[in-house]
Swiss-Prot record:
The record marks 294 as: Increases basicity of active site His. GO terms for cellular component: cell body fiber; cytosol; mitochondrial outer membrane; neuronal cell body; perikaryon; perinuclear region of cytoplasm. This is Argininosuccinate lyase. The active site is at 160 (proton acceptor), 281 (proton donor).
Length: 461
């Protein structure tokens, strides 16, 4: 039973808590997000207590009906919070007692807020996994659909932000889609470690009253139970993994956003964002700003900060539960909200993006085929290092003459290497260039189509 002060732990205290400390200690402002899973866990625990002979069937039914009523009030937005409701567990138990009386005091038998809160968090994150996994799949599907539809479009590939080699536009899209498939796989792995039940661990030593944890595991549809009660209440590996997953996913999304921001400038003019994902300037009427992409790029650092912050919290804690762990939930809630918004906006950007095919084609230049010139000599039997040097010399000759590489005459090329012959003209065909990269993973059409099929298969797993 709660003490006169209304605190679940107040029986040991004679004095009241300083109001500033009371506010400082409270987590109800954010852990109220857990109201539904907190009630879900309590329902399962009440059934576990009845199975262990700690509740009569009538008491269990009374508690379950009361918890249903509490859930209705939350769902209808009429649940009232009071100053003494320091967290979601206190609030729900207080309201349950108001509804059903003293029987509510039996619900917490053998249970600590230590195992209760981490159970709640795992339940909540399990739901979040399903949502984020769906949004991530939708984004990848949008990217693959676009890659398939625009497979014939060629444009410059860049290294060091310098034009490097001709590639398919689809190849660029898929480079980011493939990175996101790894994020999807990682999220599935994190889910496995989220889906482990700590309930029944008590505060530290376990449960002494015969509560069947395997029964609770089945009731809440967890995949396994935790192995050690001390570890169960204090470990937040699953939170750290989730935050790291989000950090890595945001890294990939930020890099894609950076590319698109550059490609959308007048200097590149390869793509144009839809009005739906752009904003303007309050001073300069001509501006169309890629705020959607800039915010994706910026929000990555917020996620990184939450991940680093949690690790800093965890690394200095002594064994078992410490109040520092209260900070984990704000990180999880914020990052979940951020990822939900970012994935949806990124999907909208990709789905509505307009590409300027002519500008992409015009940006291709013969100097980007210098590697192809080296490959030409390799096919004639020259070792690659010699071929690389010969191609480099041809580039120098063209620069000295002030002409494009493809404007060198056959005679001029033959001064570099006698292996050049009239068929060298095939080298200057951009379509021919991309089609030579037929090895799996390359930018030839057959390889790009193979990549598309592989990504689609991954999405079905």
């Amino acid at each position: 039973m709660a003490s006169e002060s209304g605190k679940l732990w107040g029986g040991r205290f004679a004095g009241s808590v300083d109001p500033t400390m009371d506010k400082f200690n409270s987590s109800i402002a954010y852990d109220r997000h857990l109201w539904n899973v907190d009630l879900q866990g309590s329902k399962a625990y009440s059934r576990g207590l009845e199975k262990a002979g700690l509740l009569t069937k009538a008491e269990m039914q009374q508690i379950l009906q009361g918890l249903d009523k509490v859930a209705e009030e939350w769902a209808q937005g009429i649940f009232k919070l009071y100053p003494n409701d320091e967290d979601i567990h206190t609030a729900n138990e207080r309201r349950l007692k108001e509804l059903i009386g003293e029987a509510a005091g039996k619900l917490h038998t053998g249970r600590s807020r230590n195992d209760q809160v981490v159970t709640d968090l795992r339940l909540w994150m399990r739901q979040t996994y399903s949502k984020l996994s769906t949004f991530l799949k939708v984004l990848i599907e949008a990217m693959v659909d676009r890659a398939e539809a625009e497979c014939e479009v060629l444009f410059p590939g860049y290294t060091h932000l310098q034009r490097a080699q001709p590639i398919r536009w689809s190849h660029w899209i898929l480079s980011h889609a493939v990175a996101l498939t790894r994020d999807l796989e990682r999220l599935k792995e994190v889910q496995k470690r989220i889906n482990v039940l700590p309930l029944g661990s008590g505060a530290i030593a376990g449960n002494p009253l015969g509560v069947d944890r395997e029964f609770l595991c089945a009731e809440l549809n967890f995949g396994a139970i935790t192995l050690n009660s001390m570890d169960a209440t204090s470990e937040r590996d699953f939170v750290a993994e989730f935050l790291f997953w989000a950090s890595l996913c945001m890294t990939h999304l930020s890099r894609m956003a950076e590319d698109l921001i550059l490609y959308g400038t007048k200097e590149f003019n390869f793509v144009q964002l839809s009005d739906a994902y752009s904003t303007g300037s309050s001073l300069m009427p001509q501006k169309k700003n890629p705020d959607s992409l800039e915010l994706i790029r910026s929000k990555a650092r917020r996620v990184f900060g939450r991940c680093a912050g949690l690790l800093m919290t965890l690394k200095g804690l002594p064994s078992t539960y410490n109040k520092d762990l209260q900070e984990d939930k704000e990180a999880v809630f914020e990052v979940s909200d951020t990822m939900t918004a970012v994935l949806q906006v990124a999907t909208g950007v990709i789905s509505t993006l307009q590409i300027h095919r002519e500008n992409m084609a015009q940006a291709l230049s013969p100097d980007m085929l210098a590697t192809d010139l080296a490959y030409y000599l390799v096919r004639k039997g020259m070792p690659f290092r010699q071929a690389h040097e010969a191609s480099g010399k041809a580039v120098v000759v063209a620069e000295m003459k002030g002409v494009a590489l493809n404007q060198l005459s056959l005679q001029e090329l033959q001064t570099v290497s006698p292996l050049f012959s009239s068929d060298v003209n095939l080298v200057w065909d951009y379509s021919h260039s991309v089609e030579q990269y037929t090895a799996l993973g390359g930018t030839a059409q057959s390889s790009v189509e193979w990549q598309i099929s592989q990504v689609r298969a991954l999405l079905q797993m």
